């Protein structure tokens, strides 16, 4: 459910169509995106825009009740993982709800992207910088 204003029409459109438990993926530049899933490609060059920046903008407009990460982020990108968990904590406080964070293998994560409403590709070039955001309700 939409909460604010995003300038990118594709992102705004996807968020406005979300129902409870629908998912949106924000990913790094390397995640394979199924041909059957809507692709919103923001990647301009390596690192632009960054993964955390895209997650921040998307979650300003999207009500989130859960997030799914690849288990591998803990070992292979611990600094980004900790920063992302902090971002999720701040989002919980802003929304006034608890956001459940679950972990799956990277292979399972890639399979789950096929069920999402869209995959938003950032320019991030660090390992396992991917998240599945599960839509909540604003009431």
From Swiss-Prot:
EC number(s) recorded for this UniProt protein: 5.4.99.62
Top enzyme category: isomerase
Gene3D superfamilies referenced in this protein's UniProt entry, alphabetically: RbsD-like domain
Segment forming the signal sequence: none
Pathway named in the protein's UniProt entry: Carbohydrate metabolism; D-ribose degradation; D-ribose 5-phosphate from beta-D-ribopyranose: step 1/2
Highest taxon of source: Bacteria
Catalyzed reactions per annotation: beta-D-ribopyranose = beta-D-ribofuranose
InterPro entries attached to this UniProt entry: D-ribose_pyranase, RbsD-like_sf, RbsD_FucU
Subcellular location: Cytoplasm
One Pfam family it belongs to: RbsD_FucU
Catalytic residues as annotated in Swiss-Prot or TrEMBL: 20 (proton donor)
Binding site for substrate: 28, 106, 128-130
GO MF term list: D-ribose pyranase activity; intramolecular lyase activity; monosaccharide binding
GO biological process: one example: D-ribose catabolic process
Keywords from the UniProt entry: Carbohydrate metabolism, Cytoplasm, Isomerase
CC annotations in GO: cytosol
NCBIfam families, per the entry: PRK11797.1 (NF008761)
Subunit details: Homodecamer.
Protein family per UniProt: Belongs to the RbsD / FucU family. RbsD subfamily.
Function of the molecule: Catalyzes the interconversion of beta-pyran and beta-furan forms of D-ribose.
Name of this protein: D-ribose pyranase
Organism: Cronobacter sakazakii (strain ATCC BAA-894) (Enterobacter sakazakii)
């Amino acid at each position: 459910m939409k909460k604010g204003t995003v300038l990118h029409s594709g992102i705004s459109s996807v968020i406005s169509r979300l129902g409870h438990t629908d998912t949106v993926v924000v990913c790094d530049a390397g995640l394979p995106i199924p041909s059957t899933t809507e692709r919103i490609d923001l990647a301009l060059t390596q690192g632009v825009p960054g993964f955390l920046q895209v997650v921040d903008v998307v979650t300003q407009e999207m009500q989130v009740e859960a997030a799914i990460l690849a288990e591998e982020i803990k070992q292979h990108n611990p600094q980004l993982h900790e920063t992302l968990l902090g971002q999720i904590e701040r989002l919980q406080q802003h929304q006034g709800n608890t956001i459940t964070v679950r972990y799956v293998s990277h292979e399972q994560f890639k399979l789950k992207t096929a069920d999402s409403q869209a995959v938003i590709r950032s320019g991030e070039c660090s390992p396992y910088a991917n998240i599945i955001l599960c839509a909540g309700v604003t009431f």
